[in-house]
Amino acid sequence: MARRNYKVLYVSGEVSPFVRVSSLADFMASFPQALEEEGFEARIMMPKYGIINDRKFRLHDVLRLSDIEVPLKEKTEMLHVKVTALPSSKIQTYFLYNEKHFKRSGLFSDLQLGGDHKGSAEKLIFFSVGVMETLVRLGWQPDIIHCNDWHAGLVPLLARTRYAKHDFFKKVKIVQSVHNVYRQGVFQPKMFQKHLDPEVFDGLEREGDDINLLATGIKYADLVTTTSPSYAKQIASDPESSFGMDKALKACKDRFHGILNGMDTRQWNPSSDKLIKKRYSAAQPELKLEDKKVLLEEVGLPFSEETPVVGVITTFDDVQGMGLLKESLSKLLELDLQLIVSGSGNKEFEQELRDLVEEHPEKLAVNTDFTDAFYHQMIAGLDMLIMPSRIESCGMKQMFAMNYGTVPIAYAGGGIVETIEEVSGDKGTGFVFTDYTAEALTAKLGEALSMFDDKERWAELMREGMERDFSWSASAEQYAELYREILG
C-alpha cells in the first residue's frame, strides 16, 4: 500500500527571505522543503508585516481568502490573505494581513524585547486565531500544525480548547519547536484576558503574574523539538541555560527531542549563489578572494590579501554575545586583522561600535542594515566568523560559513560541538573555546590567525569545511519518523 502524503502547516513569525531576524528564518526557508522530499505536503503561514515588499516577493491576493472573520472575545475583525511560493520551491506561503495590526508594524515584541507590548499582544492574538480561521476557509486540512518559537505558542492552546471540537481540527497533531529558549513571549495578561474567551485565557501558562507563550505551546503540543541533541539536554537540565524553561521541558521529557539543524544547500552554495560577486567551490577556494575584495569595498575597508578579515553576525544582546564582544573588542583591534560587525539591537552598543570605527577606520566596519544579499556576501567574503553567543541552540551561521570556506570560531555551547570539529593536527573545521571569557576568545582567535599565515594549511582547513555534509537529509528523516509516530 502506498504511504499517505500527510499535510503539515508551518506557523512562524519569520521566514527568509521575506523577513529575517534570527536563524529561525533560515530554518523556515529550508526545513519545509526537506520534509516535502520525505513525502509530506507542506504549507506555511506567517504575518504580513508592513516591512515585507509585496512586489519584490510577488505576493498576490487570493479572492476566496479575503474578508475572513477573526472572532475575538468582544469583537470580530477582518483578515485578508496574500500568497506566494517559497523561493526555489512550490511551497505555498500565506501572509495574514490586517491594516490595523500590520500596516506600519515590524515583528512581534514582548516584555523581554521592549517596544509595543500592548500592540504586539493584540496582533499576536489576531494572527493566531487568524491561522485557524484561514485553514477553515482554505479547506486545506493539516494532519500536523508545526509551531515555531513563542510567536506561534498560542496556536497549540487554541487547537486544544476553542477549536478542539471543530470537525476540521479534531484529529490534528501539534508540534512545538524551540529555536531560541531565551525568547519566550512574556506578556502582561490584560490584552489576553480582553481578547480571549475564558477557556483559552485560563489555559495560558504563567510566569509569575505574566503570560508565557513558549511554555504554553510546549504544554499543549504532542511533540516538542529543538535544534540539536546537545541543546536539548542542556536546556532540559539547566535552569540558567533554559532561562527557567527547564521545568516545562522536564514535564514533557517523553515527547521532547533534539534534532540537529540542517541547511539549504541549494540556497547556500558558493558555486551557484547568485547573491555573491564571485562563485567558487572547494576545488577552487582561491576564487573566494574576489568576494573578500567586494565585501571590504562595500563596508569601506581597504583590501590586503595578507590581512585576515574576521566577522561577527549577531543580535546585540547579552545572550547572543554582546557582553563578550564588548570585553574583547579592544584586544581584537590590537591584532593584525580587519573586523566587520553586523547586527542590530542595543542602540547604545551600536553607538559604541560607531565611535570605535572613528578611531579605527581601516580596521573596523559596522553594518546594521542586514539584507539577504549582504548576508551572503559577508559569509562569502570573510576569512573567519566569530560566534560569540553564550548559548547557541544550534544556529546555522557556522554551517553557512564552513560551506563557503569561512572558518568559524565559536563558544562550545549547544549545537556548536555537533557541527564544528575542533582543529587538531591536520583535521578539523574550526576553532572552539570552552571558557566564556574575552581571554579565551582572543587566544583561540590567535590560534586561527597563526594558521592563516600558513597558506597551504589554511586552504586545507577551508576545503575540510566546504566538503562536510550539512544538508537536511539525515535530520529530515528523523523528523519524518517522529511525525509518523504521533500520527499513529
Swiss-Prot record:
ADP-alpha-D-glucose binds at R20. InterPro entries: Glyco_trans_1, GS/SS, Starch_synth_cat_dom. Keywords: Glycogen biosynthesis, Glycosyltransferase, Transferase. SUPFAM superfamilies: UDP-Glycosyltransferase/glycogen phosphorylase. GO terms for biological process: glycogen biosynthetic process. It is an enzyme of class 2 (transferase). Pfam families: Glyco_transf_5 (PF08323), Glycos_transf_1 (PF00534). Pathway: Glycan biosynthesis; glycogen biosynthesis. The keyword Transferase applies. GO terms for molecular function: alpha-1,4-glucan glucosyltransferase (ADP-glucose donor) activity; alpha-1,4-glucan glucosyltransferase (UDP-glucose donor) activity. PANTHER family: ALPHA AMYLASE DOMAIN-CONTAINING PROTEIN, GRANULE-BOUND STARCH SYNTHASE 1, CHLOROPLASTIC/AMYLOPLASTIC. Belongs to the glycosyltransferase 1 family. Bacterial/plant glycogen synthase subfamily. Synthesizes alpha-1,4-glucan chains using ADP-glucose. This is Glycogen synthase. It comes from Chlorobaculum parvum (strain DSM 263 / NCIMB 8327) (Chlorobium vibrioforme subsp. thiosulfatophilum).
